[in-house]
């Protein structure tokens, strides 16, 4: 992150010459600072190998720090994490989804202005000498975070809190390595057969292509689907797709304090028969409405990802993390990846990512935050990204991935990717959005359905200014 990160050190004068990597003859301060420390990172998706190069680099200057990564299955991770933190057996550093911030602020030690720790320094030209120096290092500021990362990271990772003297302060509670975005996977053979030369760039073209690509039998059962969307039970991340449509349609998802506003008519939206959030919901559910020309999907279809993998649906809105799943399950499938369709206004995409944060109960908070900053610097982050084949979160690395066949589409979307605050109970908020889809499909008035969903989401909200 931060190319100038190491230039921000404020060096103290406590230096001890070492024998090898030991601390013989060191001052009490050096001896205490270089006592062996173990940092444990908890997360999902990655193995220890993904961080191996970064850990090796960090230990060159901090040989007294051992770093290990523990991988969990996605379905078990949050429960294990919450229980471990409550029982004081949790990790020093853990991965936190960008939508979890509201529910985790009381479990996090925010990034302090300065971290204090010892670093091994090698000096001399002919006779090399090793010495530990105690450093008081300035940490990343909100301005530096804003400069290095997309705007959505600042909205998610910076929390306004009250200090003991009653003033407000902005604090960083996490830093990402990668940002994923929704994109359009498309089956080349099926689009070719339908005479469609390129994937749709707008939702209007998407509708037209869906009509061309959908095939039914004599009993009107769907034999080939144009796209796997319209419902929620068998569409992975249906609430993200709906949120993307809402935001592209001009919906303001929340106010400045995080309270839901997607049921409202935004200022300056002109004469509309329906609020944009309700319009977007109708647009989405039309694909699963048998009375509509764009009908292409229903709850009897398989999971949308499975349908795409088996060639039964032509288009699938998904994330980069699903790419290796598709490649592994269907190595002969001819498919492409295109940017998410747009609604005609300013480009907007949907962000889905994880932040690395430090537990309030860690006994090595300064070292833990120093490692998080080191890991998310552009020099080190690129090693993780190359090992995992994930899209970057850093502005400085976007161009490096822009022409990559697998990552280019996703990397090019991160600067326009947005998300929205879902309070302290993300599961409850997402269930409210899923039920919104079901209610409209069941025939409820769209405005009534979005009103109900907004009221339910509001019950999960902790005001951002008081977290």
Where are these regions (language model features)?
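Short, solvent-exposed loop/beta-turn-alpha elements that line the ligand-binding surface or hinge
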Residues: 114-148, 231-232, 251-278, 328-329, ...
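Hinge/lid segment of periplasmic solute-binding proteins
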Residues: 100-181
């Amino acid at each position: 992150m931060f190319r100038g990160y190491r230039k921000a050190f404020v060096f103290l004068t406590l230096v001890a010459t070492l024998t090898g990597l030991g601390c013989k003859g060191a001052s009490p301060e050096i001896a205490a600072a270089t006592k062996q420390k173990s940092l444990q990172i908890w997360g999902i998706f990655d193995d220890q190998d993904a961080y191996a190069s970064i850990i090796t680099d960090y230990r060159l200057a901090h040989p007294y720090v051992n770093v290990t990564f523990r991988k969990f299955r996605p379905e078990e991770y949050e429960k294990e994490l919450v229980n471990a933190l409550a029982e004081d057996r949790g990790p020093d550093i853990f991965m936190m989804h960008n939508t979890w911030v509201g529910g985790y602020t009381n479990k996090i030690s925010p990034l302090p202005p300065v971290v204090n720790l010892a670093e091994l320094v090698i000096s001399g030209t002919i006779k090399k000498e090793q010495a530990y120096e105690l450093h008081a290092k300035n940490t990343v500021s909100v301005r530096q975070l804003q400069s290095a990362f997309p705007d959505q990271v600042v909205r998610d990772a910076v929390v306004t809190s009250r200090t003991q003297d009653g003033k407000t302060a902005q604090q960083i509670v996490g830093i990402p390595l990668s940002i994923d975005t929704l994109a359009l996977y498309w089956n080349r053979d099926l689009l070719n057969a339908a005479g469609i030369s390129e994937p749709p760039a707008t939702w209007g073209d998407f509708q037209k292509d869906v009509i061309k690509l959908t095939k039914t039998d004599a009993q009107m059962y769907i034999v080939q689907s144009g796209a796997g969307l319209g419902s929620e039970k068998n569409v992975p991340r249906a609430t993200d797709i709906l949120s993307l449509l809402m935001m592209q349609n001009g919906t303001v998802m929340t106010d400045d304090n995080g309270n839901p506003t997607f049921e409202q008519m935004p200022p300056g939206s002109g004469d509309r028969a329906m609020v944009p959030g309700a319009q977007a919901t109708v647009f989405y559910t039309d694909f699963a409405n048998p009375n509509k020309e764009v009908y292409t999907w229903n709850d009897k279809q398989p999971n949308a990802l499975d349908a795409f993998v088996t060639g039964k649906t032509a288009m699938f809105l998904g994330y980069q993390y699903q790419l290796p799943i598709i490649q592994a399950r269907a190595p002969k499938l001819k498919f492409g990846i295109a940017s998410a369709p747009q609604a005609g206004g300013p480009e907007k995409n949907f962000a889905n990512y994880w932040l690395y944060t430090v537990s309030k109960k860690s006994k090595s908070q300064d070292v833990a935050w120093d490692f998080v900053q080191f890991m998310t610097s552009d020099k080190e982050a690129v090693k993780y990204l190359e090992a995992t084949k994930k899209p970057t979160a850093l502005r400085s690395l976007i161009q490096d991935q822009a022409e990559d066949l697998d990552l280019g589409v996703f990397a090019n979307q991160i600067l326009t990717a947005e998300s929205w605050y879902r309070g302290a109970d993300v599961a409850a908020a997402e269930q409210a959005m899923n039920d919104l889809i079901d209610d409209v499909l069941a025939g409820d008035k769209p405005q009534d359905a979005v009103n109900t969903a907004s009221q339910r989401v509001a019950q999960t909200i902790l005001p951002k200014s008081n977290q």
